[in-house]
From Swiss-Prot:
Top-level EC class as recorded in UniProt: oxidoreductase
CC per GO annotation: membrane
Domain of life: Eukaryota
MF-aspect GO terms: heme binding; iron ion binding; monooxygenase activity; oxidoreductase activity, acting on paired donors, with incorporation or reduction of molecular oxygen
UniProt xrefs under InterPro entries: Cyt_P450, Cyt_P450_CS, Cyt_P450_E_grp-IV, Cyt_P450_sf, Cytochrome_P450_monoxygenase
Sugar-bearing residue positions: N146, N346
Name the UniProt record assigns to this protein: Cytochrome P450 monooxygenase tropD
Gene of this entry: tropD
Record: residues binding heme: C454
Principal cellular location given in the protein's record: membrane
Localization of this protein: Membrane
Chain segments annotated as transmembrane: 7-27
Lineage: Eukaryota, Fungi, Dikarya, Ascomycota, Pezizomycotina
Family: Belongs to the cytochrome P450 family.
Cofactor entry: heme
C-alpha cells in the first residue's frame, strides 16, 4: 500500500513537471508563431540570449547591419523583437504623438539606490506621464539660445586644454592618445556647465577619481542585459546583489548626490540663493530652483536630472568629437576644406566664438557626417507596438511586439544616404535640392526622434562646434597609427587609441599640415 501511494505521488509530481514543460513550450511556440512571417536568424527567433551574445562581441552594430543586408528592412532580432532599417519608418516608430511607449530595455540604464531602487530619468522613464513630468520643467534649459549662454564657461575649458596640449605635447612632438583628451575635455565641460567647476581631468591628464571608468563599466554592464532586462533585476538591481558587490552605478550616484547635497546646503543657508547666483547659474542651480518653485516636483527629480547630465553629457559628446577628429585626420582633403572655410570666415583664434561658427556650411556638414557615421548610441531604440499593430515596409507587426531601429544601421541606409553611405563624405549634406536634403535630415536617428528626441542635442552640437574649429585652427595634428584606432559598441561607442602628434600652428598660418 505504501509503495502504491509513493508511486501515485511520484506520478503526480511527474505530471506537474510535464504540464509545466508543455505549457512553456506552447507559450514559446505561440511567441514564435505570431512573428513567423518576419525573416531573421532561427536562433534569434527562439531566445533573446542570441542578441545578447551579439552585444558581448562589442560589434553588435556590425552584426545588425549584416542581418539587414541579408534579410531586408524588417528583421526579427528576438522572439518578440523586430528591427527596422528604413529611415522612412522613423516617424511611425517614434512619432510626435503618444503611441509607442518604451519597454524595459531602458531600465538597466537607471543607476540603482537601495532607498529608491533604480531611479528613472527623462531618457529611461517608461511611463509617458512621468516622462513629461520630468521633461517639461527643464526643457527650456536645453534650448540652443539658453545653451549658448554657457559659452564663457566652455571658453574657460578651451583655455585649459589649449595650455595642456601646448605644454605636454606640442612643444616636443610627443605621441599621445587624442581620444583620451577629447573625453577629458567633454567631462570637464560637463562639470563646468552642471556644477560650475572642472574636475581636473585636463589639468591632471587622467581620469580623476575613476569617474570615466565608472561610467564605462556601468555601460558595459548595462548593454548586454538591455537585451534581457529581467537579468538586470536578478543580477544587479536588488539589495542582495548590491550588498555582495556594489554596481558601477553606485559610484556615479555617490558623485552626483554629494554635489547636490553640497549645493542644497548652500541654498538652504542663503534665503537669497537665487538672487546671489543670478547670471551665474549652472544646470544644478536651475534644477534646484525649479524644484523649490513647484511643490508638485519631488526632490528626487533633481537627482534624476543631474544624473542625466553626468551619464550622457560627457560620453555621447566625446564620441562625436572623437569620430569627427578621426575622420578628418584620415581624410585630409576634408580637413583642408574645413580649415579653408574657417580661415575664410575669419574665425577667432585661439577660441572661436559661437556667433562665428554656428552657421558655417561645411562645418555643419562635417558635424552631420560625424553624427551619421558613428552615432554615440548603437543599439536599437526599442518601443512597444500599440493595439491594432503596424504596417512597416510591407510587413505587418502585431500589437505588443517590441520594435526598434538602430541609429548606426539607419544612418547608413544607402537609398537615403547614397551608395557610398559607408564612407566619410561630408559633402553629401550639401548636395541635392530641398526635398533630398530634408529626407537626409529626417532620416538621421542619432538623437532619436519624435516626442522622445534627445534633450541634450543642442548641448552636444554646441560643444562640438566650439572644439573642432579650435583644434583645426590652432594645431597641425597628424595621426600616427590609424590602424590602432578602436571603436567598440557598449551601448555607447567606446573609441580609443587615436595616436597623434601635434604642433602649434603659427598665427599667420593658413594651411593645415596634412
Amino acid at each position: 500500500m505504501a509503495y502504491g501511494s509513493q508511486l501515485t505521488l511520484l506520478s503526480g509530481g511527474q505530471s506537474i513537471i510535464i504540464l509545466l514543460i508543455v505549457s512553456f513550450l506552447a507559450w514559446r511556440f505561440r511567441v514564435w508563431f505570431r512573428l513567423r512571417h518576419i525573416p531573421g536568424p532561427l536562433g534569434a527567433s527562439l531566445t533573446n540570449f542570441v542578441r545578447m551574445s551579439w552585444v558581448f562581441t562589442k560589434k553588435a552594430h556590425l552584426i545588425h547591419q549584416e542581418l539587414h543586408q541579408k534579410y531586408g528592412d524588417v528583421v526579427r532580432f528576438g522572439p518578440n523583437m523586430v528591427s527596422i532599417s528604413d529611415p522612412a519608418s522613423i516617424h511611425i516608430i517614434y512619432p510626435m504623438r503618444k503611441g509607442l511607449v518604451k519597454n524595459d530595455f531602458y531600465v538597466p540604464l537607471r543607476p540603482y539606490t537601495r532607498n529608491r531602487g533604480a531611479i528613472p530619468n527623462v531618457f529611461t522613464a517608461l511611463d509617458e506621464d512621468l516622462h513629461m513630468k520630468l521633461k517639461y520643467p527643464v526643457a527650456s534649459l536645453f534650448s540652443l539660445s539658453n545653451v549658448s549662454k554657457f559659452e564663457v564657461l566652455v571658453d574657460e575649458v578651451l583655455s585649459v586644454i589649449d595650455e595642456q596640449l601646448d605644454r605636454r605635447f606640442a612643444s616636443h612632438g610627443e605621441i599621445f592618445d587624442l581620444t583620451e583628451w577629447l573625453q577629458f575635455f567633454a567631462f570637464d565641460v560637463m562639470g563646468t556647465m552642471t556644477f560650475s567647476k572642472r574636475y581636473g581631468f585636463l589639468e591632471e591628464g587622467k581620469d580623476v577619481g575613476g569617474m570615466l571608468n565608472a561610467i564605462g563599466q556601468f555601460m558595459k554592464q548595462a548593454a548586454p542585459v538591455m537585451q534581457n532586462p529581467w537579468l538586470d533585476r536578478v543580477l544587479y538591481k536588488n539589495r542582495i546583489a548590491d550588498s555582495l558587490k556594489r554596481t558601477p552605478g553606485s559610484d556615479i550616484m555617490k558623485f552626483v548626490v554629494a554635489a547636490i547635497n553640497e549645493r542644497q546646503k548652500s541654498a538652504s543657508e542663503d534665503e537669497d540663493f537665487t538672487k546671489a547666483r543670478k547670471g551665474k547659474n549652472d544646470f544644478l542651480d536651475e534644477y534646484i530652483i525649479t524644484q523649490k518653485k513647484d511643490s508638485n516636483i519631488p526632490p528626487w527629480f533633481v537627482t534624476a536630472w543631474t544624473i542625466s547630465n553626468v551619464l550622457a553629457g560627457s560620453d555621447s559628446v566625446g564620441t562625436v568629437m572623437k569620430t569627427t577628429m578621426y575622420n578628418l585626420l584620415t581624410n585630409p582633403r576634408t580637413l583642408e576644406k574645413l580649415h579653408a572655410e574657417l580661415v575664410a570666415a575669419n574665425v577667432s583664434r585661439p577660441r572661436p566664438r559661437w556667433s562665428e561658427v554656428h552657421n558655417l556650411p561645411y562645418l555643419d556638414a562635417v558635424v552631420q557626417e560625424a553624427l551619421r557615421v558613428h552615432p554615440p548610441f548603437a543599439l536599437p531604440f526599442e518601443r512597444i507596438v500599440p493595439e491594432g499593430g503596424l504596417h512597416i515596409s510591407g510587413q505587418y507587426i502585431p500589437a505588443n511586439t517590441v520594435i526598434g531601429a538602430s541609429p548606426y544601421v539607419v544612418n547608413r541606409h544607402k537609398p537615403t544616404y547614397g551608395d557610398d553611405a559607408e564612407l566619410w563624405r561630408p559633402e553629401r549634406w550639401l548636395e541635392g535640392g530641398p526635398e533630398v536634403r530634408k529626407k537626409r535630415d529626417d532620416g538621421l536617428l542619432t538623437f532619436g526622434a519624435g516626442r522622445r528626441i534627445c534633450l541634450g542635442k543642442h548641448i552636444g552640437i554646441f560643444e562640438v562646434k566650439k572644439l573642432i574649429p579650435f583644434l583645426v585652427l590652432n594645431y597641425d595634428i597628424s595621426i600616427v597609427k590609424p590602424e590602432t584606432f578602436l571603436a567598440e559598441n557598449e551601448w555607447f561607442f567606446r573609441q580609443s587609441n587615436l595616436l597623434a602628434q601635434i604642433r602649434r600652428r603659427p598665427l599667420e598660418s593658413v594651411e593645415p599640415n596634412v
